[in-house]
């Protein structure tokens, strides 16, 4: 009995060792780091930071085209946080929800628009950061830490009383739920991004470049939906943790 439980636990822990494609490894001391994640992640961050600087450099009371676009994005992200977390608590969490959404969107679009697998390197291959299970698991664990912090900061130790509500019989199920949340977030994002990259790469290799365009457009749409789902669920989990348990 206990042997099976340990095997199940080990399968969850070993999820970070899942490898798809040929990774570009950097060796630092005794550790091996996925270099393609660092390279493409920094490219995505540079693009996002550059857009943010360009969009906020010359702010005016009468917004121009680019400023209008940036304000639209900000209002969209504010609405996600406000609708899921609540009007009184959402402002503190806007930076986190916005960062999660924009990073995932940028990473997904990088994978959908750029055929990284066609770029030859002496060793390994480039890919979108969200094409690596380690990245998606890390993002999901950040969300787990965020909603634990939200619950403890709002309700103190009383936050853990939710595990025995509405009855102590549900304690194991409520504890298991906290493990399934990051797993579902990470695998959903990883699976969708990986599938999209593989489809685009195969079509690009088999047929002329114009044929895969509809697939790439569909990939952009699906990538945007995945970023929206991840950030919305993250905000929903935080909002759930901030609720007063046991209150009418």
Swiss-Prot record:
InterPro entries: ATP_syn_F0_a_bact/chloroplast (IPR045082), ATP_synth_F0_asu (IPR000568), ATP_synth_F0_asu_AS (IPR023011), F0_ATP_A_sf (IPR035908). Its main location: plastid. It is found in: Plastid, Chloroplast thylakoid membrane. Pfam families: ATP-synt_A. One of its GO terms (cellular component) is proton-transporting ATP synthase complex. Gene3D superfamilies: ATP synthase, F0 complex, subunit A (1.20.120.220). The chain crosses the membrane at residues 35-55, 94-114, 133-153, 202-222, 224-244. F-type ATPases have 2 components, CF(1) - the catalytic core - and CF(0) - the membrane proton channel. CF(1) has five subunits: alpha(3), beta(3), gamma(1), delta(1), epsilon(1). CF(0) has four main subunits: a, b, b' and c. Key component of the proton channel; it plays a direct role in the translocation of protons across the membrane. This is ATP synthase subunit a, chloroplastic. The lineage of its organism: Eukaryota, Rhodophyta, Florideophyceae, Rhodymeniophycidae, Ceramiales. The gene is atpI.
